[in-house]
């Protein structure tokens, strides 16, 4: 049976094994998928050991940059992202590194009926999560995409790097005031029960769509703030399922149906 897994530390909380088990059952693929607690001080050796038999793996924090460096070949979107969340062993034994995060976000937004083309998008944060989704968002040709970060210089850096891909600009949080069509929260503020300092004027009730890359059983602080102002909101559980489907297709050549898997995970979250 073909062996797959997910590298992380910690890894006990990961929903990836359940997601891929549901995908495998649905598509009739014979495979195993396990959580892999990798050591913080020697990820490459641990990963190479797994790939003596393993066919592919997902990579989560804190190993995405190390996976990027150890891949023998990179997809264009992984190269742009500077991080790898999916590894595939090729026929010749080399490792292909991919990044499916941005494709997962875009797929979930489209599933929710969000139009990206010609829209004004605000992306909060300037870390790895934001870097990973910039290219796929810009591929849909928004009218404008603003990267906002507490430290505006980090947002500026990303704008310079990705400038040729579309209409990008950078901002600090305090300078934001103009209403937008879509806000994507790529900060980890929700994990700490916090909210970036945002002006209520960014949201137009009934028009602005607000998406948090984080998810939890209860609405995140960001989603609560947005909903109170009349925005439509969605958390990142669908992104998790969609990026997993993208990885599954890379490994197995078959695209699973994500809707029933997302519904099952949502039911379990309560």
Swiss-Prot record:
GO terms for biological process: amino acid biosynthetic process; aromatic amino acid family biosynthetic process; chorismate biosynthetic process; shikimate metabolic process. One of its GO terms (molecular function) is shikimate 3-dehydrogenase (NADP+) activity. NADP(+) binds at residues 76, 125-129, 149-154, 213, 236. Its EC number is 1.1.1.25. Keywords: Amino-acid biosynthesis, Aromatic amino acid biosynthesis, NADP, Oxidoreductase. Shikimate binds at residues 14-16, 60, 85, 101, 215. It is an enzyme of class 1 (oxidoreductase). It catalyses: shikimate + NADP(+) = 3-dehydroshikimate + NADPH + H(+). GO terms for cellular component: cytosol. The active site is at residue 64. It comes from the Bacteria. Pathway: Metabolic intermediate biosynthesis; chorismate biosynthesis; chorismate from D-erythrose 4-phosphate and phosphoenolpyruvate: step 4/7. Gene3D superfamilies: Leucine Dehydrogenase, chain A, domain 1, NAD(P)-binding Rossmann-like Domain. Involved in the biosynthesis of the chorismate, which leads to the biosynthesis of aromatic amino acids. Catalyzes the reversible NADPH linked reduction of 3-dehydroshikimate (DHSA) to yield shikimate (SA). Belongs to the shikimate dehydrogenase family. HAMAP family: Shikimate_DH_AroE. Homodimer. This is Shikimate dehydrogenase (NADP(+)). It comes from Stutzerimonas stutzeri (strain A1501). The lineage of its organism: Bacteria, Pseudomonadati, Pseudomonadota, Gammaproteobacteria, Pseudomonadales.
